[in-house]
């Protein structure tokens, strides 16, 4: 047994709870040990909405078989509808302890409210090997299967379903808002946003949209594939990260919605001129900042791939390594990542990830909060742009879309600015430096080298020396 310094994702039950907490009218029952009911506290601390998480705990403990006290699963499922009459769907999540107990799921019938009884979604695919992200994806598919009705007539004007991240996703609400703004810009409305903020009734209206836009493939993959097979709904999977990726996604949406390509292109150009800072940043910044710079990227799926495309093709950085911790998406990830890097990998052990990053010898690390220590040990800048991240800001900013490209440009400016190469320490008057003095100057942080050089040369003039030696350089710093 080995002690890990962290994990990238939680158990499958946590993914189910995240999806349930993202939606309206859905209540989750967590079958787990009494000490595992931490989700409501985590939800309150992260979301800050003032509302309780729609999660109830059914404690797993020894009791008489005919007991109807707390912990009886059938009773706990039935009581949810009684205590929360607004519930339209109940989803059952089981912890690893509950799964290993191998108890049977009871048959429960809910009373009708307003002529309609809530549905019970049991997630029969659960097993200890399914992680948080995959479980969230499968849980959303189960909810869509249970509530998506027959093929509805398409809306008169073009509309799209947005499938994005659930709660706890960094900047999740901001990502939806940016995508909705961009779709409105090209003349496409939003039919519904799934799962964040969607109601059970919204799931029944999914088939009325013209296209499904997959912002976050990790959670919407299975649901959109079901809608594609069942109702023939086409989907757009291009990551909206960076200016080029956003433009490609908008043009694809325009084609599927039969929009005028010239108007779509005009809208894209307008955003490039008005909002997107990344292309301008890449062209107007000093070339030395990007030349032969290597970046290592690690995260979930959408963000590492989107950032890999943007940093390699728009900024000009060399992607030394790109990896994910999602083993169930390994084939798709490697297929896409190999288009911009030779070193693509799948790994969920933080120590192995650290070793991979160190071996790639990067100048910049982009990843989850677990990669910050690796960047510190290498002495290179770190950008926490891929989930999971522990920093939760009050003001959410998107990383997708043209607004997100400006956020990315600002982050790169802060990170790469510390790596700017100072010119060789040569004074206008021609004062030379010894080799040892140059080596000492090279060990000075880049943003302090200019001042250190001037102080050393002033000190040499005061001492009447014709060159800057190691002793003069060290003496000038006192």
Predicted regions and their residues:
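An N-terminal assembly and electron-transfer interface module characteristic of large anaerobic redox
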Residues: 1-430
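Non-catalytic accessory segments flanking P-loop/AAA+ NTPase cores
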Residues: 424-478
